């Protein structure tokens, strides 16, 4: 945590923060996925359950990140429109009130389409989590250690690349390009893993 705080504060090296953020997400989430499927889900681990794991992971994340943020924005807008926000700001010290207004200004300065972009981002995240869950499932079920290791590393790598592109991309590209890129990578992962699984299933039968 200390390292992350230093990294976040050091804006002179933003790329170091981008690498850290993407790597941390990939390592913690994929390791958790791997442990869950290797040990906790050992008796029930099959393709449908791996699929549901990905849906659950992505769905809960969408609720916590997108849903709660949306509710917070909605409540703030209702308070502003009803005049309740003015009363709240009046009760705050001047410095705190100015900071609050600065934060709330994003609600009326942000272009409306960008609020829909966050929903598309969550859809892409759910698709990605499904694909990565199926990839880790294949790693756990792989008969050969080399194949299992390669598949697991592939999941870590894909997660890192997608997250790095998502956090570093806005510094170079328009947000719409970033979201399209993330969606393509997420969908590509899911389609490829599903196709590989179906081909392997057909070969066995």
Predicted feature residues:
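Transmembrane alpha-helix/helix-exit interface in multi-pass inner-membrane proteins
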Residues: 55-98
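Generic transmembrane alpha-helix signature in multi-pass membrane proteins
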Residues: 22, 33-40, 53-54, 65-69, ...
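Membrane-helix boundary elements
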Residues: 93-116
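A loop-to-helix transmembrane entry motif
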Residues: 112-126
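Juxtamembrane helix-boundary/capping and inter-helix hinge elements in multi-pass membrane proteins
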Residues: 40-48, 141-145
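Transmembrane alpha-helical insertion/packing segments
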Residues: 4-5, 9-28
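Functionally important transmembrane alpha-helices
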Residues: 122-195
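Conserved small/polar residues in nucleotide/adenosyl-binding loops
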Residues: 1-10, 196-203
């Amino acid at each position: 945590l200390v390292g992350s705080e230093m990294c976040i504060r050091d804006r002179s090296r933003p790329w170091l923060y981008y690498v850290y953020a993407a790597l941390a997400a990939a390592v913690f989430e994929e390791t958790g996925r791997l442990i869950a499927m290797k040990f906790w889900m050992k008796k029930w681990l099959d393709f449908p359950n791996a699929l549901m794991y990905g849906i659950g992971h992505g769905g809960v994340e969408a609720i916590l990140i997108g849903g709660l943020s949306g509710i917070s924005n909605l409540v703030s807008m209702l308070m502003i429109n009803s005049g309740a926000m003015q009363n709240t700001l009046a009760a705050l010290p001047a410095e705190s009130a100015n900071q609050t207004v600065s934060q709330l200004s994003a609600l009326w300065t942000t272009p409306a389409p960008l609020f829909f972009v966050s929903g598309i981002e969550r859809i892409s995240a759910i698709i990605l989590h499904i694909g990565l869950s199926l990839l880790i499932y294949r790693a756990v079920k792989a008969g050969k250690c080399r194949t299992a290791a390669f598949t697991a590393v592939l999941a870590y790598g894909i997660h890192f690349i997608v997250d790095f592109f998502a956090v570093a991309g806005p510094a170079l590209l328009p947000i719409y390009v970033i979201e399209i890129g993330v969606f393509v990578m997420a969908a590509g992962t899911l389609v490829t893993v599903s196709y590989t699984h179906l081909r392997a299933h057909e070969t066995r039968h």
